[in-house]
C-alpha cells in the first residue's frame, strides 16, 4: 500500500511530514500517474517507483534549504518543487519550464491539492527575468552544473545559493564549474528504497 510505504520511507529519511501533507503527496503521485498516460511527463510508470524516484528523491533535499523563496528550473512535472512545496507551506516556489503541457499539469496539481505557495511559469530559463532574486535556485536532472550556473546566474538574490541535485559525480562535471562560482558543500543524500548515488551540490557566486 502506497500510504504505508510513504509513511515508512519518510520515517527512514528522518522527515517530519504531517498526515495532510502525506495525503497531498499521494494525491500528487495519483495525478502524475493519470496525466502521464496521455502527456508522457516521466519515464517512470509505476506509482510505487514514482514515490521513491520522484517524491522521496525530492524531499530529502528539504532539510538543506535555506531561505523562503525558491525557483525550480527545468522542473518538468514539478520535481522537486511540488513535493518540497507540500512539506514547506511557509516557503514559496516558482516552477519554471519551457513546455506548456508540463505547466498545465502543475497548475492542475496546484488547484486540486490547494497549494497556494507555488506558481508556474512557462519560459526558457535564460529568458526569465524575475522582479526579485531568489534565496535558492534548484535544479534536478536539468543540465550539467556548468550549464545550470551559466543559464541561471541572474536568478539568485545577493546572498542566494544554487542547489544542484545530482546522481554520481564525475570529475569532468565538477571541473566544469565556471569562474565566478564557488562550490561550498557537497552533501551525500540517502533516499529510502534507492541504491543509486544521490548528491546535493550547494554553490554560490564567488
Swiss-Prot record:
EC numbers for this chain: 2.1.1.170
Keywords: Cytoplasm, Methyltransferase, rRNA processing, S-adenosyl-L-methionine, Transferase
Catalytic activities: guanosine(527) in 16S rRNA + S-adenosyl-L-methionine = N(7)-methylguanosine(527) in 16S rRNA + S-adenosyl-L-homocysteine
The protein's enzyme class: transferase
SUPFAM superfamilies, per database record: S-adenosyl-L-methionine-dependent methyltransferases (SSF53335)
Protein residues bound to S-adenosyl-L-methionine: 74, 79, 125-126, 140
GO terms under cellular component: cytosol
InterPro entries: rRNA_ssu_MeTfrase_G, SAM-dependent_MTases_sf
Stretches of the chain forming a coiled coil according to its record: none
UniProt subcellular location: Cytoplasm
One annotated GO molecular function: rRNA (guanine-N7-)-methyltransferase activity
Superkingdom, taxonomy of origin: Bacteria
Family note: Belongs to the methyltransferase superfamily. RNA methyltransferase RsmG family.
Biological function: Specifically methylates the N7 position of guanine in position 527 of 16S rRNA.
Protein name, as recorded: Ribosomal RNA small subunit methyltransferase G
UniProt source species: Shewanella amazonensis (strain ATCC BAA-1098 / SB2B)
Gene name as annotated: rsmG
Amino acid at each position: 500500500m502506497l500510504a504505508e510505504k510513504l509513511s515508512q520511507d519518510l520515517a527512514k529519511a528522518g522527515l517530519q511530514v504531517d498526515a495532510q501533507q502525506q495525503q497531498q503527496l499521494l494525491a500528487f503521485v495519483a495525478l502524475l500517474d493519470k496525466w502521464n498516460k496521455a502527456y508522457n511527463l516521466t519515464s517512470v510508470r509505476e506509482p510505487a517507483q514514482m514515490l521513491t524516484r520522484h517524491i522521496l528523491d525530492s524531499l530529502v533535499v528539504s532539510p538543506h534549504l535555506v531561505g523562503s523563496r525558491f525557483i525550480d528550473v527545468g522542473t518538468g512535472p514539478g520535481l522537486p518543487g511540488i513535493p518540497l512545496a507540500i512539506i514547506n507551506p511557509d516557503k514559496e516556489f516558482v516552477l519554471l519550464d519551457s513546455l506548456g503541457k508540463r505547466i498545465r499539469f502543475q497548475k492542475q496539481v496546484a488547484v486540486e491539492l490547494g497549494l497556494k505557495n507555488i506558481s508556474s511559469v512557462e519560459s526558457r530559463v535564460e529568458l526569465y527575468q524575475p522582479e526579485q532574486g531568489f534565496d535558492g535556485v534548484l535544479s534536478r536532472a536539468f543540465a550539467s552544473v556548468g550549464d545550470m550556473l551559466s543559464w541561471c546566474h541572474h536568478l539568485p538574490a545577493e546572498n542566494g545559493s544554487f542547489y544542484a541535485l545530482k546522481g554520481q559525480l564525475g570529475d569532468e562535471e565538477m571541473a566544469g564549474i565556471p569562474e565566478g562560482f564557488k562550490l561550498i558543500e557537497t552533501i551525500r543524500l540517502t533516499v529510502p528504497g534507492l541504491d543509486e548515488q544521490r548528491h546535493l551540490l550547494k554553490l554560490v557566486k564567488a
